[in-house]
A protein has these predicted regions:
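Stable alpha-helical structural segments in soluble proteins, enriched in small hydrophobic residues
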Residues: 53, 57, 131-143, 149
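Glycine-rich, flexible loop segments associated with nucleotide phosphate handling
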Residues: 24-25, 99-100, 160
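Acidic, His- and aromatic-enriched active-site or binding-groove loops in soluble protein domains
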Residues: 102, 141-164
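RNase H-like nuclease fold core
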Residues: 1-52, 63-64, 137, 145-147, ...
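Short, charged, low-complexity patches
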Residues: 50-55, 102
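Low-complexity, flexible helical/coil segments
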Residues: 44-50, 67-68, 107-112, 155-163
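Amphipathic alpha-helical surface "interface" segments used
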Residues: 128-133, 156-169
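RNase H catalytic domain
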Residues: 15-21, 41, 58-136
Length: 188
């Protein structure tokens, strides 16, 4: 692909682990300008999807790139092509589905797009785009890290709760050496 030196090319990919109950989602970008990689970014969160994370990161990129710029997002996720289409009940009906997901982010993207000369999305082939592959790999790593930190934090909280419960247990509720409840202090 021949690049225009004035355009910001933003490779964007995402990942989500639908198989886990805490469902982590992540997105990453690699930004090229004037033939050079100028920035990389990655985000992740729990109880979300890769699409929400990708739209969140699109919004962040549009906010950070200088006003009046030309921005082209390059991805294999057709979902984000509608980042600037106002969600309506009629658009949902015509597709026989519920209303478009993430309307809050779409509205913000529409507003942020106004700051720039042009903002578009181009679908590219995943296996032919090393920088797109990188974004998916980085999004997957960030998502896995977020999930791991969540479980480590919950395990620490669980252990802390058990320690507090055993330390604060009144003597009458503690067991004696023979396994029966020790209530000798009550008979005094």
């Amino acid at each position: 692909m021949t690049q225009d030196t004035s355009t910001y090319y933003v490779w964007i990919g995402g990942s989500c682990d639908y198989g886990h109950k805490e469902r982590a989602g992540g997105a990453a970008v690699v930004i090229e300008h004037n033939g050079n990689i100028i920035s990389r970014d990655v985000i992740s969160d729990l109880h979300t999807t890769e699409f929400r994370m990708m739209q969140t990161l699109m919004l962040k990129v549009m906010q950070e790139i200088p006003e009046g710029s030309d921005i082209l997002f390059l991805t294999n996720a057709a979902y984000i092509q509608n980042f600037d289409k106002t969600p309506t009940a009629k658009s949902a009906e015509s597709r026989g589905r519920k209303a478009r997901a993430n309307p809050d982010l779409i509205i913000q993207c529409i507003e942020e797009k106004k700051r720039h000369n042009s903002v578009g999305v181009k679908i590219v082939q995943y296996h032919k785009s090393p920088l797109l592959i990188e974004t998916h790999d980085r999004a997957t790593e960030a998502m896995a890290k977020t999930r791991k930190e969540f479980h480590q934090k919950n395990n620490r909280l669980s252990v802390s709760s058990e320690i507090v419960a055993s330390v604060s247990m009144p003597p009458c509720a503690q067991e004696g050496e023979d396994g029966t409840e020790n209530s000798s202090h009550l008979s005094r």
